């Protein structure tokens, strides 16, 4: 979706009079645009569920998810004021906050979404068992514009591997295209991240089953030594069909970021509402079980990066100082 189309879709963060009545009073609705990613991936799944639970919990909100190209488009759209809030993977967020390859961003964190443990999935009948086995093979590294190829690039760099030189790297136009490419043999492996990630679930749930490939303990240590911002993460046993043991790997936290000038009062209300629906959100979507106020404080690189209205609410409930 290009910027022009997004601008034409509607004015952002509108306070509009709703038809609903509350004791004879017109309810003022705050409309909030939420950028997600391409269809078929984890971000639209999460974003749609987020909007549903938030809108159900607070009738004054109208959160509207929109498909975009993903993290690398969401950041400039937020900075241009053409989205109110958006889902952003950990690596693009890290680069934006640190000013790597670009000026430092003034965007702020609304909430941590979930941790994103990175790994590959292959067919169970494939001969590939290690990352080195995939060198020279066709690998789908995720959708163009998403954070997944950035995470894989950092991890492979920690092992001395170049994503576009040591692999036949393929970037998808739609995140949902990856599983079929693994299953029909067009690619040897699909890179992804997360617990309950749709691409992994599709391959693991297929008739032939799947095997996951993650860095071993020595490789994790090598990657961590070079990419210090990546965190050791675990995919618990049973996260995917026929996954009998836990998988240790590395990854990062994805965030919902807010445009720099998002009203502090609106952000405070969003944080308060989200805190109130943490359990309901978890029941609706497994990935959302990590979307908590406490995890946001832990996952944020610094409290100064948390939106001021959100931080004010966190201090009120005692999860932040």
Where in the sequence are the language-model features?
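Pocket-lining segment of extracytoplasmic ligand-binding domains
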Residues: 90-92, 100-101, 126, 163-262
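Short, solvent-exposed loop/turn segments at the edges of secondary structure
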Residues: 113-117, 250-251
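N-terminal (or domain-start) structured segment
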Residues: 21-89
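Short beta-strand-centered segments that line the small-molecule binding cleft or hinge
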Residues: 105-114
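Hydrophobic h-region of N-terminal signal peptides that target proteins for export
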Residues: 11-20
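An extracytoplasmic/periplasmic, membrane-proximal ligand-sensing/linker region
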Residues: 177, 183-185, 194-212, 222-229, ...
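Bilobed "Venus flytrap"/periplasmic-binding protein-like clamshell domains
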Residues: 31-57, 61, 115-184, 279, ...
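Bacterial N-terminal signal peptides that target proteins for export
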Residues: 1-8
């Amino acid at each position: 979706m290009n910027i022009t189309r997004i601008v034409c879709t509607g004015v952002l963060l509108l306070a509009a009079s709703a038809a609903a009545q509350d004791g004879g009073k017109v309810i003022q609705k705050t409309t909030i645009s939420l950028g997600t990613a391409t269809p078929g991936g984890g971000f639209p799944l999460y974003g749609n569920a987020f909007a549903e639970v938030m809108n159900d919990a607070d009738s004054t909100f109208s959160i509207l998810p929109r498909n975009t190209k993903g993290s690398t488009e969401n950041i400039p759209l937020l900075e241009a004021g053409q989205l109110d809030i958006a889902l952003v993977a950990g690596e693009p967020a890290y680069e934006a906050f640190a000013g790597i390859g670009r000026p430092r961003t003034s965007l702020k964190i609304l909430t941590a979404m979930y941790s994103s443990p990175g790994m590959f999935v292959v067919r169970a009948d494939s001969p590939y068992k290690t990352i080195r086995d995939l060198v020279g093979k066709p690998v789908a590294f995720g959708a163009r514009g998403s954070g997944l190829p950035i995470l894989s690039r950092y991890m492979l760099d920690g092992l001395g591997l170049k994503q576009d030189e040591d692999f036949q790297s393929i970037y998808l136009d739609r995140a949902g295209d990856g599983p079929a490419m693994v299953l029909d043999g067009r690619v040897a492996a699909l890179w992804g991240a997360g617990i309950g990630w749709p691409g992994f679930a599709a391959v693991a749930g297929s008739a032939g089953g799947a095997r996951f490939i993650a860095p071993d303990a020595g490789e994790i240590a090598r990657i961590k030594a070079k990419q210090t911002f990546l965190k050791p993460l675990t995919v618990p046993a049973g996260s995917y069909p026929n996954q009998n043991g836990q998988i240790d790997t590395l990854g990062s936290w994805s965030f919902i970021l807010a445009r720099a000038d998002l009203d502090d009062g609106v952000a405070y209300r969003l944080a308060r509402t989200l805190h109130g629906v943490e359990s309901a959100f978890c029941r609706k979507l497994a990935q959302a079980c990590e979307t908590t106020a406490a995890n946001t404080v832990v996952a944020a690189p610094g409290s100064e990066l948390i939106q001021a209205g959100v931080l004010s609410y966190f201090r009120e409930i005692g999860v932040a100082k």
